[in-house]
Amino acid sequence: MDSEKTVGSWDLLAKMKDIEVRAIARSKQRREQQALPFHAEGKGKQEPPEQTAQLIEFPKWPEDRRATAQAVFRSALFPAMNFKQGRPYLEREHLWSVDGVEIFFTGKQLDQSDLDVYLELLKIAHQHPFGTECHFSAYSLLKALGRATGKANYKWLHSVIIRLCGGIVDMTDHHIRYFGGLVNGGIKDENTQNYVVRINTDFAHFFKAGLWASLDNQQRLDLKRNQTAKALHAYYSTHVTPGPHTFEKLAGLIGLCNKKRRDIKANLIKAHEELKRIGFLSDYEAGEKTVKPMINHTPSQNRYIVKKVVINPAMK
């Protein structure tokens, strides 16, 4: 009798366990069905949303050149300054620029050494579509910049990348207005010192519209840390045949501020001498208030000049 009770008890427990398992299974099935996207009756499977993002490729430029939006070179976004007392923080600062370009900047003020890094990042990124992650090591980037690879420069490089991420530009070049960071962000492996960074895809519209310019990288490297000469080199690289500029205007465009007029003129003339030394300028004419540079044209610039002369014989 006791054995029959024991068998009956085990049967009852087994049935209860089976009911519990089936209840759990039904509950799980209901949750999975509720998680599925709702399809309106009679309309079948829902179509995926239309893709509105447009893939924009970088234009191709030679390995020995560095490029960015021309508004960067035609403004004081990366001024010719040396910050010995720390960098000022700017709040929607209206920067000097040429006609047709307007830039407001918020963040720690940048300089030409920041532009060195930014141009190198764009060089790495330009092999891929905008928004694609670009990979590089701190060592390789420092070597490309001609800098030593000691601990101090690794720290310096990271500070520049953070500064480029943190600065916000509101930049208009003719009909295109971009607002955002120059670098979108990224990650770093602290063991290998390898980086992954992204460039904001919206910045691509300057390139798509043809509003970009490039410069000779070896010439820029030859200028070493001469901030004034580097800024002038970048600005003049957006011109085929630049006309006379007043010293005052040049000083504003490359960010030479808070200096005496006489010192500014002397600084600019020395910078023109440097541009002549590296072969960028064949010569220049400096007057009392203006300076006119004569550029050694690239083959593509020579073709452009010939084409304009053919179209407009009055230029001869």
Model-derived features: positions:
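Charged, alpha-helix-forming regions
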Residues: M1-K316
